[in-house]
């Protein structure tokens, strides 16, 4: 069976690049939904809920496009020492996040949601990443690029400066970039059967 068009509810250029790797037709649309964590819910419940809220908002905002498409959305966070690191709000927060990750292992969690007609699938993928120690001058140089400010945990593993300090990865690399491709592709295949 032919895979329907994907309606990607994301402003992330990285998610668009990743989805393009699957060589399936997709359209990216903008949705603005709050990415607020509920204290009473688990991390997994939160990222799955946020992803589903984005997908439902895309369905509401783009009814014509979504009527025959699979809607895909995601939410990525970094977890380190029991803290949730989302997108930093400024240089100081980016510096604190990046310094806390140096020489240590953290987890990257991506909740994703797929809506297709009445069908729904939500899940979460987790990848563990270990960084070598990074000198403060390198961290400041990276922050000066502006790259940390639209990324959970204040870094992009694919960014050349950061990639040179990754000493280990356990799980899906693409999950750290923003979308666990193999898990998403498997879920899409199940939806269209």
Curated annotation (Swiss-Prot):
Superkingdom, taxonomy of origin: Bacteria
Chain segments annotated as coiled-coil in the UniProt record: none
Annotated active site: 75
Site residues by UniProt (Important for substrate specificity): 14, 76, 158
Enzyme class, first EC level, given as a word: hydrolase
Cellular component GO terms, alphabetical: cytoplasm
EC number per UniProt: 3.6.1.9
Protein name: dTTP/UTP pyrophosphatase
GO biological process: nucleotide metabolic process
Reaction catalysis annotation: dTTP + H2O = dTMP + diphosphate + H(+); UTP + H2O = UMP + diphosphate + H(+)
Organism: Chlorobium luteolum (strain DSM 273 / BCRC 81028 / 2530) (Pelodictyon luteolum)
Keywords, comma-separated and alphabetical: Cytoplasm, Hydrolase, Nucleotide metabolism
Record family assignment: Belongs to the Maf family. YhdE subfamily.
The protein's role, per its UniProt record: Nucleoside triphosphate pyrophosphatase that hydrolyzes dTTP and UTP. May have a dual role in cell division arrest and in preventing the incorporation of modified nucleotides into cellular nucleic acids.
Origin organism lineage: Bacteria, Pseudomonadati, Chlorobiota, Chlorobiia, Chlorobiales
InterPro entries recorded: ITPase-like_fam (IPR029001), Maf-like (IPR003697)
């Amino acid at each position: 069976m032919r895979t329907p068009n994907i309606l990607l509810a994301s402003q992330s250029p990285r998610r668009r690049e990743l989805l393009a790797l699957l060589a399936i037709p997709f359209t990216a649309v903008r949705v603005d939904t709050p990415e607020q964590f509920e204290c009473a819910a688990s991390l997994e419940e939160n990222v799955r809920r946020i992803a589903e809220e984005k997908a439902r908002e895309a369905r509401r905002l783009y009814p014509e496009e979504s009527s025959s498409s699979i809607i895909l959305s995601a939410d990525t966070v970094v977890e380190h020492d029991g803290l949730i690191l989302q997108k930093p709000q400024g240089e100081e927060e980016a510096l604190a996040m990046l310094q806390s990750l140096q020489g240590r292992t953290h987890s990257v969690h991506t909740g994703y949601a797929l809506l297709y007609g009445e069908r729904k699938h939500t899940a979460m993928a987790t990848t563990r990443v270990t960084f070598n120690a990074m000198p403060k001058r390198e961290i400041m140089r990276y922050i000066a690029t502006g790259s940390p400010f639209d990324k959970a945990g204040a870094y992009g593993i694919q960014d050349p400066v950061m990639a040179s300090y990754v000493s280990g990865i356990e799980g899906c690399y693409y999950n750290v970039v923003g979308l666990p491709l193999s898990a998403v592709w498997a879920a899409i295949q199940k939806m269209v059967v």
